[in-house]
């Protein structure tokens, strides 16, 4: 069943599916995630129970920020599909940099992202210079999720729109050639097959274990 565009996403389900997908298909991600968890464990030992922002609060906030990106990118994917249908010549986003069609500047000014990153920044501010230097694994892990996650969310929503818009827009017809070009471009970017790419499903029906 098709789910509501914006409000149906469950943070736990989204993260579970994204992380599981990347562990299967993204080179270096499994090691990056392992290093991230080791870094968090080190910080727990160093900070103890006296931290103003705990490691667990930091971990949750970091993933909240990622989820904010995913939701916004999914919205943009739905919108891009309709924009392309209405005016394909003016809305071929495959010809521009992903930073443009994912609107990263706007994504990182959204209230949910701001709230989450305020907590992230507060956590870093309490670290000593030595501990800050030991957080490269966090930066690497976050970079993996921020680089790939929004692209996958945008693509997933774009394809979902192909089957949803005919139900609500008279005369709508999905552009199969453009959809194929999109999935081919993204699969090539990730170094995977189109079949592997289409295993992604970040809606609320995905259940985390």
Which residues make up each language-model segment?
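Intrinsic-disorder/low-complexity detector
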Residues: 1-193, 204-209
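Extended oligomerization regions of viral-like shell subunits
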Residues: 194-200
